[in-house]
Amino acid sequence: MESEHAERVADGASHLWKDFMKTTPELCAKEASPCSCVTGYKSKILRWNRVEAPLDMSNDISGCFLFPYKKKESCNMVNFKENEELKTLNHSCAHLMAQAIKHLYPQAKFWVGPVVAEGFYYDVDLGEDVIRDEDIEKIEKEMKKIAKSGKKIMRREVSKAEAMEMFKNDEYKLDLISDLEDGNITVYDQGDFTDLCRGPHVDNVKLCRNFKLIRHSGAYWKGDSKNKVLQRIYGVCFPTAEELEAHLKLLEEAKERDHRKIGKDMNLFMVDDLVGRGLPMFLPKGYVIWQELENYIKNKERKLGYLHVMTPCVGTVNLYKTSGHWDHYKENMFPPMEMEGESFVLRPMNCPHHMMIYANRRHSYKDLPIRIGEIAHDFRYESSGTLKGIERGRHFCQNDAHLFVTPEQIEDEFTKVVDLIFSTYKDFGITNYRCVLSLRDPANKEKYHDDDAMWNKAEDALRTVLNDLKIDYTEEIGEAAFYGPKLDVNVQPAVGNEITLSTCQLDFCLPAKFNLSYVDRDGEKKTPVVLHRAILGSLDRFMAYILEETKGNLPTWLAPVQVRVMPVKTDNEELTAYAKEICDALEAKDVRVELDDRSEKLGYRMREGQVQKVPYLLVVGFNEKEDRTVSFRLHGEKDTTVLPLDEFVEKLENEIKNKLRTHIGAEK
């Protein structure tokens, strides 16, 4: 399924540089994602020293945002959307950071410094120098010094020849300038620093004084792994110190919710460079969660008539040439393996295999819909800068399915898929999501299957269902799969950019490429339509999201260890014997239970159980043994509850069987 792992991200994304110098300021502001924490942004510290007049974007004076206005040009920035003001501030702060870096590293050369969801960044080539953690403080100190100077930020229009001369020793800027048209090139001056940029910017560096550089990493130039690795430094800027402080607190909270930290603390998965970057390995406890997710979704699908299959992780190059993926997706695939005169590739998706399963036998209209599902292992060569734990890797497992339907069944089957998505979200308590109808860009004939009638029909079909179901959604041009439009359900993880959890894609293209058919009621051969869908998306990514949403405080049915039993005195045979009896009673009901009878202090064992996010911590003392009770504490709670052993076992069995969310999210 093409949408899986396909959303645009800031790290390593090549789309940013292509349009960076060509877009108008209003489009730049539109495209840059706002920070999620500034919804209530009310600051008026940004001062717009311009003529008060209605802002009219239709007059093609986009250069007037914060520029020395020309005759008859004026802007009313007071009415401009507040988050757009914040983006402008962050973009200006990127220039402030670049100026500071240039002061400290005179050899520095800069690529681009856009605004992204988490603030801003700038890619820089420092030659032999490498930015380390201790250097960040030095850069911040220089930035504060420059901001305090109160230098004005001024826009200048220059000719292409002037720009080439101005940046003649900077191959990165020359590369940008080469794509620009003469008469449409601007630079910004602030004191002794000049940068090539379309803007917009605030008019004084002192407005950028409330900033923080938050991290640094490597990034390929233009997002291409064949190019040099530049140093990328991220930062964030706010109009007031109070807003900055609040945001930094949110960042600290986000770090605690990062699934990579939780996975390490709970011993769930690991990544090792010797195995390969982007190739996570699930440890025993992590694999328990993975299996529970697999069983959960397969059981739901079986009740809806899905037929589960297993297909190989490789296929011939010819298979992907037939499907069209070789032409449209080759750059995201691992290179071919040549063996005995055949070329094989690790599969990046499962559609071609499922097409061949359908083609294995003849079908009548009476057979349709046919719903083929699989928990499938897929491989995609993601750039190293985009890799992120189990949320985004080079190997992942998709909860994939392909529904083969007649044209008359499209809307009904699409409705059932949408219902399945939202019933699943209800089970997991997922409420904060955004629905996106991804459409083709009609002007891009190379990216998409060229059939206007097919596209119009497919897009209208999905719109109809979404409107009938009264689902709020936005449309995004140019984000469809190459073979058809799709519905993506996106969520915001604790760290990083928005991700896609679920997707449903409508496809008139692949069935024809594979010559699939069914016999209709008139005895004529017809081509089926295919719905590609993934409810959990990839199990890896879904697991990462749930870990972050719950801070690892999983519902009991999903927890790798559901109960930990701890005798107060580990050297007392009677207490240890009763603790083992409790474990036996729970194991008989398929409860995942651990006996912790190590010769450690009880407080130490309790704290370890809390770090491991075990839902039920049971303490066995002499009172519990005599009364045949259990004394337990739910994770995230301080109160202790005492129940008879049989009653506790029954309670826990019911909670797990019915997948109750008794304590999920208690640490939120």
Positions of PLM-derived features:
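Intrinsically disordered, low-complexity segments enriched in serine/proline and basic residues
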Residues: 13-14, 32-33, 52-62
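NTP/phosphate- and nucleic-acid-binding module
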Residues: 20, 70-111, 115-119, 123-668
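Cationic, low-complexity basic patches in intrinsically disordered or flexible, solvent-exposed regions
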Residues: 3-8, 27
